[in-house]
UniProtKB/Swiss-Prot annotation:
Protein name (database record): Sulfate/thiosulfate import ATP-binding protein CysA
Oligomer and partners: The complex is composed of two ATP-binding proteins (CysA), two transmembrane proteins (CysT and CysW) and a solute-binding protein (CysP).
Organism encoding this protein: Halalkalibacterium halodurans (strain ATCC BAA-125 / DSM 18197 / FERM 7344 / JCM 9153 / C-125)
Function: Part of the ABC transporter complex CysAWTP involved in sulfate/thiosulfate import. Responsible for energy coupling to the transport system.
SUPFAM superfamilies referenced in this protein's UniProt entry, alphabetically: MOP-like, P-loop containing nucleoside triphosphate hydrolases
Similarity remark: Belongs to the ABC transporter superfamily. Sulfate/tungstate importer (TC 3.A.1.6) family.
Membrane topology: Peripheral membrane protein
GO CC entries: ATP-binding cassette (ABC) transporter complex
Catalytic activity: sulfate(out) + ATP + H2O = sulfate(in) + ADP + phosphate + H(+); thiosulfate(out) + ATP + H2O = thiosulfate(in) + ADP + phosphate + H(+)
Keywords: ATP-binding, Cell membrane, Membrane, Nucleotide-binding, Sulfate transport, Translocase, Transport
Documented EC number(s): 7.3.2.3
Domain ABC transporter: 3-237
Gene that specifies this protein: cysA
Molecular-function annotations in GO: ABC-type sulfate transporter activity; ABC-type thiosulfate transporter activity; ATP binding; ATP hydrolysis activity
Length: 357
C-alpha cells in the first residue's frame, strides 16, 4: 500500500507544525521521519493515521483519498512509544483486542483468533507467553507485544511513533535489528518517527529529515549522511567541524590557512562560504604539509575502538574534533598539549543563503 502526502499543512494556534508537505512512500517501504523536537514528524504521522486533521492538503493510500476517512476505517496499525498495553489483559488478550472488537460480521471465530495470536507470538519471538500480563514483561517484550497487536488486524500501513524511545540503549539496538528483519518478512508499508539519527540510518529504506515543519531532505540512509543538502542536515546527522572563510577559485581562505574545496567552487572568485567536514574525515600528521592546520591537542578520550580528540586552533578561539581508529592513534603516539597538523578531507561547501535560522 503506497502513501501519498500532498500539500499538507497543519497549525496549532500560532505555531505552524507542518508547512506544505509533499511526500510519496512506496508499497513495502520502511521510511523514517527524522528530526528534532518540534520538527513536525509526529504531527505528520498522526495525520497519516487520521488521529489529527490537516488544515489543508490530502492523504492518499494507493489511489484512494483518505483525508476525510475516520482513523478506524483507514486500516492502520499504530505503535506508540509507551506500549499502551492494557495492564489488566493477558498478552493473548492484548494481541487479539483489535480482532475481538470488530463488528460481528467481520470478526474471526475464537479458533481463528487463537491461531492468529499463536502466529504473531511466533513472529515476535515470544512463544509461550500467552497468559502473562504486561507487568510480567520487560520493556522490549512489551514493545514487541504492542507491535504484534498492531499487526493482528492486518493493517495496510504500519505507523510507529518513537517505538524504542522508552527503552535502554542495548535493548533499542537489539530491537532495531529485529524490526528490520520483521519488516523484510512482513513487507507492510511502514513509517516510523524518531529523533535518533543512528536508529533512522540503521533501520530505514529511506530517511525523511524534517526541521521546523518542512522536509529538508529525502534519501537513502547513505545519501542523507554522505550527501547532505543543507547545513541543518549535515549538522543534525552527526558531529561536524565548521570553517568560515572566503572561497577563491578552488580554495577557501581561513585567515592564514588555505583549504582546497570541492570542484564546484573553482568558478567562484571571492565569496563568503562555510565549509563542513566530519571528525572522522580529519587526518593528523606530525609534519607540516599543504592544506594542514596547526592545532594543539587539548583533550583525548577513548570509546571502544575510537579515539576522540579535541584540538585548539586559531589562537585557541576554536575547537576541532577529530576521530581516529585506536591503532592509528597509538601509531602516532599522540599526547595532550602537543602541536600537530590537521588536514580536513571530504569537504562540503555551503553559502550563507543556504542556512535556516
Amino acid at each position: 500500500m503506497s502513501i501519498v502526502i500532498q500539500n499538507v499543512s497543519k497549525s496549532f494556534g500560532s505555531f505552524q507544525a507542518l508547512a506544505d508537505i509533499n511526500l510519496s512512500i512506496e508499497t513495502g517501504e520502511l521510511v523514517a521521519l527524522l528530526g528534532p523536537s518540534g520538527s513536525g514528524k509526529t504531527s505528520l504521522l498522526r495525520i497519516i493515521a487520521g488521529l489529527e486533521a490537516a488544515d489543508q492538503g490530502d492523504i492518499y493510500f494507493h489511489k484512494d483519498k483518505v483525508t476525510q476517512t475516520h482513523a478506524a476505517s483507514r486500516q492502520v496499525g499504530f505503535v506508540f512509544q509507551h506500549y499502551a498495553l492494557f495492564p489488566h489483559m493477558t498478552v493473548a488478550d492484548n494481541i487479539s483486542y483489535g480482532l475481538r472488537v470488530k463488528p460481528r460480521k467481520e470478526r474471526p471465530s475464537k479458533k481463528e483468533i487463537a491461531e492468529k495470536v499463536r502466529e504473531l507470538l511466533a513472529l515476535v519471538k515470544l512463544e509461550g507467553m500467552d497468559d502473562r500480563y504486561p507487568a510480567q514483561l520487560s520493556g522490549g517484550q512489551r514493545q514487541r507485544i504492542a507491535l504484534a497487536r498492531a499487526l493482528a488486524v492486518e493493517p495496510k500501513v504500519l505507523l510507529l511513533d518513537e517505538p524504542f524511545g522508552a527503552l535502554d540503549a542495548k535493548v533499542r539496538k537489539d530491537l532495531r535489528k529485529w524490526l528490520r528483519k520483521l519488516h523484510n518478512e512482513f513487507q507492510v508499508t511502514s513509517v516510523f518517527v524518531t529523533h535518533d539519527q543512528e536508529e533512522a540510518l540503521d533501520v530505514s529504506d529511506r530517511v525523511v529529515v524534517m526541521n521546523q515543519g518542512k522536509i529538508e531532505q529525502v534519501g537513502s540512509p547513505d545519501e542523507v549522511y554522505e550527501q547532505p543538502k543543507s547545513p541543518f542536515v549535515y549538522d543534525f546527522l552527526g558531529n561536524v567541524n565548521v570553517f568560515t572563510g572566503r572561497v577563491k577559485q578552488g580554495f577557501v581562505q581561513l585567515d592564514k590557512h588555505q583549504l582546497k574545496t570541492p570542484t564546484i567552487s573553482k568558478d567562484i572568485h571571492d565569496q563568503e562560504a562555510v565549509v563542513y567536514t566530519r571528525p572522522h574525515h580529519m587526518e593528523i600528521s606530525r609534519k607540516k604539509q599543504k592544506d594542514a592546520i596547526p592545532a594543539v591537542i587539548e583533550h583525548i578520550h577513548m570509546v571502544g575502538p575510537i579515539a576522540f580528540l579535541e584540538l585548539n586552533w586559531k589562537d585557541d578561539e576554536e575547537v576541532l574534533q577529530v576521530e581516529l581508529a585506536k591503532d592509528r592513534f597509538h601509531e602516532l603516539d599522540l599526547k595532550k598539549g602537543e602541536t600537530v597538523f590537521v588536514v580536513p578531507k571530504n569537504l562540503t561547501l555551503f553559502f550563507p543563503e543556504e542556512f535556516t535560522i
